Amino acid sequence: MHENSFKSTVLAALALALAPAFSQAYEAGVESDNAPVAATTPALIPMTAQVTAKLPTLDNRLQKTDRLLKNLSDNSDPLREADVWGRIRSGYAIPDINNQLVANHVNWYATRPDHLARTTARASRYIFHVVQELEKRGMPTELALLPFIESAFNPQAFSSASAAGLWQFVPATGRDFNLKQTMFKDDRRGVLASTDAALTYLQRLYDMFGDWQLALAAYNWGEGSVQRAIKKNQALGKPTDFESLADLMPAETRNYVPKLQAVKNIIANPAQFGLTLPVVDNQPYFTAIDKTSDIDITVAAQLAELSTDEFKALNPQFNRPVIIGGEKTKILLPQENAAKFTTNLAQWGHALSSWTTHKITNARERIETLASKFGTTADVLRQANNIPQRTSLRAGSTILVPKTSATMNKDITQEIADSATMLLEADRPERAAKALRRVAKGGKVQTAPISLVKPRIQRGGGNSRAKARH
């Protein structure tokens, strides 16, 4: 497509995107005035409260349009940048802050080049995708640096508050954004799903506050907390920008935007701080492949000619050694390995999956008993199902077991994958000391053992304490 034609197409799409906001503002003015106004004379529409209420949304759309047009200009075409870092720099759009907190965090990163090297190396797998998604939405590209702060670009990161993944979603917020969390998969760690959810959330917060710094504060602290801080300053006649609200924020949130600013400054000019960024090509690192049938992670890695660790780095959402196939199941592979996977899969003459599920019906079943039943070892079952030592399975639990000849050609159903849970309890000590207590009854003395308290452990997609930041 020629450049002029491309720009014309984008401008036409932008006009369609902006049309609803103009239409809503116009209609609000007409309805509030309760009198017909010719569509050809919109300047005559009075600025009613309803129209004014529409203006933040319209202003946000216009700002997004400005950023999109900037990316189309000859000097800032993102596809012309030599690497992803240059592409990110060209899309910076959040106002800078310059205070002592920023200086402190710049110094922290600048004096830890090893940390920066590890983080940027991990980021090289994912950051092109994040930048591309930001540009599609007309959002500031420095938001692609937020996982530096959240997770150090480690998709396996898991906090003490049960936040997980690149973008550190807690379970409840993850469910709010349709991030599935089951025994087999946690989409909070999935690169595609979590990035889509995080950008949707950030855009929603920006639409709410009309300010990216406040949107970031709300991402960390919660929108309700930011709203209350704004109301408090408004009541005192004080400004409500991020720095004016900082004294009302917890330390983590007060440092959150300055940390992002520090990373932003370093990416903008690493040489100024004696640092070097790795070259990250301005092109996709991975591609997505649909997988409609079950496949073991080890088999998928083998077919793609990848190490298991590298495969898991791109597909960290899978919790078990088997990937449940389905219409929405995708695996990510480096561009050069995707073709190898397709070729090797076509020539593969063996079963793709060696696992199926088994539901516990007995009141309590030992792992050793199950291992014997399915021709494997207790250690294999514990490792496949993340079962700690000295625990047993309770009735209703679903676990992975090796396939038998009867189940070799059967995949695990989506219904089972979505509903499976695992209930564990601590094994009874083999030599539990029986404390005896005397109970007088009918002139006779009886003895009875004191009951043992058996702690229960639930694993899978259960609830956990929500993290304050989300």
Q: What does each model-found stretch correspond to?
A:
Residues 143, 174-176, 231-234:
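Active-site-adjacent bridging/hinge elements
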